[in-house]
Amino acid sequence: MSNVSLSPSAVSRIMTRVCWLVRQDSRHQRIKLPHLEAVIVGRGPETKITDKKCSRQQVQLKAECNKGYVKVKQVGVNPTSIDSVIIGKDQEMKLQPGQVLHMVNELYPYVIEFEEEAKSPGLKTHRKRKRSGNSDSVERDASQEAKPSTGAEPGSNPSQCSVPPKKEKDAATKKESLSHWSQGLKISMEDPKMQVYKDDQVVVIKDKYPKARYHWLVLPWASISSLKAVTREHLELLRHMHTVGEKVIADFAGSSKLRFRLGYHAIPSMSHVHLHVISQDFDSPCLKNKKHWNSFNTEYFLESQAVIEMVQEAGRVTVRDGMPELLKLPLRCHECQQLLPSIPQLKEHLRKHWPK
């Protein structure tokens, strides 16, 4: 038996993982989320939130540092959301690196970042943290929706929604904390490995978490924060985005009998206009809950042509009140309108409507 000796420094220093809650606009310092400890966050001096619609106890956060996510429980009455999906009073969702937590009413955006800390007994903690530029926040990794699939079928890779091996997951977590998320989308748009199509006006990338066999995003190179910023000056661009979406369908799914829709989410999860091009099979393990389904199968999903007509007639896009409530509607088949009690039963039902 061989004897293995450890250096004094190796013995005296222990690496631990810690989690931080980071306000995207840097209005206040980061909030530490100790491993498995419940932390209440809301209106108050710590967050500098004074909005009375935000409760002093708006959310309860519990970091799973070893697993790389934070459990978020909505405690306040007004809606807290993750990537524009409302959690619901006394309900809980997982917040992962790259996702955006809006504290209340789609306001006050936060992200999480994980760090490795080297602790020496009796000495000051040493942090080991990757940075990009001067940013202290995490990159949103081209948003939750931007990283390309790499499956056997173009536009589809259901396996990427399953739990990856731990080493890969840790590597992905570190990658997601390289820079501020608002830079991430631009980085992905310009990454040749992520691009399906590009021209001088737009680029098409695969959705990171496709909700169907085929799911792409068409994004303009021009910086347009959201549909609210769209004017008549953007009409030709909107038309071009629609045309490119149809081209991608023809190029990559031309032999498929699947039906497609092109449209925008009424309340998008990224601060850059993006057109969803999605097949209507909804055959993907990434489609996990009612909010996922309703975001594509209610009026929450704005048809591309309807948006173009709205801008042409009114000069802007108007989103009616109450859109978040649509995400709570019962599950209803988009083909035959039958009500289904659960996502697994809905998915089984949808198989009946797939092209033979």
Curated annotation (Swiss-Prot):
It is an enzyme of class 3 (hydrolase). The modification Phosphoserine is found at residues 132, 137. The record marks 188, 265, 276, 291 as: Interaction with DNA substrate. Keywords: DNA damage, DNA repair, DNA-binding, Hydrolase, Metal-binding, Nucleus, Phosphoprotein, Zinc, Zinc-finger. Residues 38-87 form the FHA-like domain. Pfam families: DcpS_C (PF11969), FHA_2 (PF17913), zf-C2HE (PF16278). GO terms for biological process: single strand break repair. It comes from the Eukaryota. Its main location: nucleus. Residues 120-179 are annotated as: Disordered. The active site is at 274 (tele-amp-histidine intermediate). One of its GO terms (molecular function) is mismatched DNA binding. It catalyses: a 5'-end adenosine-5'-diphospho-5'-2'-deoxyribonucleoside-DNA + H2O = a 5'-end 5'-phospho-2'-deoxyribonucleoside-DNA + AMP + 2 H(+); a 5'-end adenosine-5'-diphospho-5'-ribonucleoside-2'-deoxyribonucleotide-DNA + H2O = a 5'-end 5'-phospho-ribonucleoside-2'-deoxyribonucleotide-DNA + AMP + 2 H(+); a 3'-end 2'-deoxyribonucleotide-3'-diphospho-5'-guanosine-DNA + H2O = a 3'-end 2'-deoxyribonucleotide 3'-phosphate-DNA + GMP + 2 H(+). A motif (Histidine triad motif) lies at residues 272-276. Its EC number is 3.6.1.71, 3.6.1.72. Residues 207-211, 269-270 are annotated as: Interaction with DNA substrate. Residues 1-110 are annotated as: Interactions with ADPRT/PARP1 and NCL. PANTHER family: APRATAXIN (PTHR12486:SF4), APRATAXIN-RELATED (PTHR12486). DNA-binding protein involved in single-strand DNA break repair, double-strand DNA break repair and base excision repair. Resolves abortive DNA ligation intermediates formed either at base excision sites, or when DNA ligases attempt to repair non-ligatable breaks induced by reactive oxygen species. Catalyzes the release of adenylate groups covalently linked to 5'-phosphate termini, resulting in the production of 5'-phosphate termini that can be efficiently rejoined. Interacts with single-strand break repair proteins XRCC1, XRCC4, ADPRT/PARP1 and p53/TP53. Interacts with NCL. Interacts (via FHA-like domain) with MDC1 (phosphorylated). This is Aprataxin.
